[in-house]
């Protein structure tokens, strides 16, 4: 018996970290996927070639294996499995590798067990795994990997799928990441020390996200870049940017991008830039020191 499923990675356009405090956020699935295949086996093995992982244990753990171990505990029986994970994105890159892996594994386990409960339950189950492993997580990453396309997560945590022509977006990433759990904990500590200031910062991020959503619904991408720059300034004030992420952000702007910001938890990982009419220039400029790619959207969710 063998089953497989695939889920996309994502880029957060607006609202990362604020979304942990029930502020809205906008995310887009990108054409980089994680595919998981599970098959019956005499003992449990996990193979992730892109990470050089060949792991054998009844309860996989350590790094990204924590997400797999928790999924098996919650959504599988005790029978041994061979689990193979093909990842088209670097782990820890701010592009949602943990969420895409979790959603794809839950999809493969559901098919293996003959379950069919729809995307809402899949997203909820995957979100529970991220919370259990990370200590805190919004439903954003797991929702976008489940539903695909474009998602606006509102302040009541409702998933609103929508369509818009995002135009020319570029994603660039570093070779290292800031561990999401650690970055989320750092923002929580700053919130504890400066609750009023941080509360106002998150309120302002909410205004930026809602302005962007309103304009995208009108298919107006003109203010997108400037709104990204405003969001970046507030991410910097949350303490999640780094010298190198700031260098990438400014390299993209100097090459003509209308705006650019961190995408994901920060501390490392990736940036996103809106580059109307200058995608090639921005990719060329960023590729001098980092790894950049034109992001393709309108991507399917869990399949
Ligand atoms: N080379 C690696 N081997 C195993 N686990 C890794 C490796 N690189 C990153 N990880 C783990 O992968 C997970 C990535 O999840 P996260 O930090 O949420 O980043 P993202 O979701 O943005 O990709 C983390 O648990 C991290 O410890
Ligand atoms: C920082 C946060 O808003 C997004 C984290 O994204 P990623 O795990 O770095 O891809 C956390 C969350 O939404 O759970
Ligand atoms: Mg993650």
Curated annotation (Swiss-Prot):
This protein's UniProt keywords: ATP-binding, Cytoplasm, Isoprene biosynthesis, Kinase, Lipid biosynthesis, Lipid metabolism, Magnesium, Nucleotide-binding, Transferase
Family: Belongs to the GHMP kinase family. Mevalonate kinase subfamily.
Any GO CC annotation of this UniProt entry: cytosol
Keyword NADP annotated: no
Function, in words: Catalyzes the phosphorylation of (R)-mevalonate (MVA) to (R)-mevalonate 5-phosphate (MVAP). Functions in the mevalonate (MVA) pathway leading to isopentenyl diphosphate (IPP), a key precursor for the biosynthesis of isoprenoid compounds such as archaeal membrane lipids.
PANTHER family associated with the record: MEVALONATE KINASE (PTHR43290:SF2)
Location relative to the cell: Cytoplasm
Subunit field text: Homodimer.
Cofactor(s) named in the record: Mg(2+)
Catalysed reactions listed for this entry: (R)-mevalonate + ATP = (R)-5-phosphomevalonate + ADP + H(+)
Gene Ontology biological process terms, A to Z: isopentenyl diphosphate biosynthetic process, mevalonate pathway
Cited InterPro entries: GHMP_kinase_C_dom (IPR013750), GHMP_kinase_C_sf (IPR036554), GHMP_kinase_N_dom (IPR006204), GHMP_knse_ATP-bd_CS (IPR006203), Mev_gal_kin (IPR006205), Mevalonate_kinase_arc (IPR022937), Ribosomal_Su5_D2-typ_SF (IPR020568), Ribsml_uS5_D2-typ_fold_subgr (IPR014721)
Associated pathway: Isoprenoid biosynthesis; isopentenyl diphosphate biosynthesis via mevalonate pathway; isopentenyl diphosphate from (R)-mevalonate: step 1/3
NCBIfam families: mevalon_kin (TIGR00549)
UniProt protein name: Mevalonate kinase
Record gene name: mvk
Main location: cytoplasm
SUPFAM superfamilies, per the entry: GHMP Kinase, C-terminal domain, Ribosomal protein S5 domain 2-like
UniProt EC number: 2.7.1.36
Residues given in the record as ATP binding sites: 90-100
Active-site annotation: 141
Any one GO MF annotation of this record: mevalonate kinase activity
């Amino acid at each position: 018996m063998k089953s497989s499923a695939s889920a996309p990675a994502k880029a957060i356009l607006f609202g990362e970290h604020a979304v942990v405090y029930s502020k809205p956020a906008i995310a887009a699935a990108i054409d980089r996927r994680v595919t998981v295949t599970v098959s019956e086996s005499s003992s449990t093995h996990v193979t992730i070639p892109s990470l050089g992982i060949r792991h054998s244990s009844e309860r996989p753990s350590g790094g990204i294996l924590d997400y797999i171990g928790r999924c098996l505990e919650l959504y599988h029986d005790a029978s041994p499995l061979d689990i193979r994970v093909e990842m088209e994105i670097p782990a820890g890159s701010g592009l949602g590798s943990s969420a895409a892996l979790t959603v794809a594994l839950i999809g493969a386990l559901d098919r293996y067990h003959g379950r069919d409960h729809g995307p809402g339950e899949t997203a909820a189950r995957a979100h529970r795994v991220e919370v259990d492993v990370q200590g805190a997580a919004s439903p954003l990453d797991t929702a976008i990997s489940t539903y695909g396309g474009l998602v606006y997560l509102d302040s009541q945590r409702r998933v609103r799928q929508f369509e818009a022509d995002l135009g020319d977006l570029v994603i660039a990433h570093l070779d290292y990441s800031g561990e999401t759990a650690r970055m989320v904990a750092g923002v929580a500590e700053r919130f504890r020390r400066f609750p009023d200031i941080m509360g106002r910062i998150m309120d302002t991020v909410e205004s930026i996200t809602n302005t962007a959503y309103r304009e995208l619904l009108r298919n107006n991408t003109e203010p997108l870049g400037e709104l990204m720059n405003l969001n970046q300034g507030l991410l910097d004030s949350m303490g999640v940017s780094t010298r190198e992420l700031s260098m990438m952000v400014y390299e993209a702007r100097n090459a003509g991008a209308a705006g650019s910001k961190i995408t994901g938890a920060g501390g490392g990982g990736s940036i996103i830039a809106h580059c109307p009419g200058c995608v090639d220039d921005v990719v060329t400029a960023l590729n001098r020191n980092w790894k950049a790619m034109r992001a393709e959207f309108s991507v399917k969710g869990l399949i």
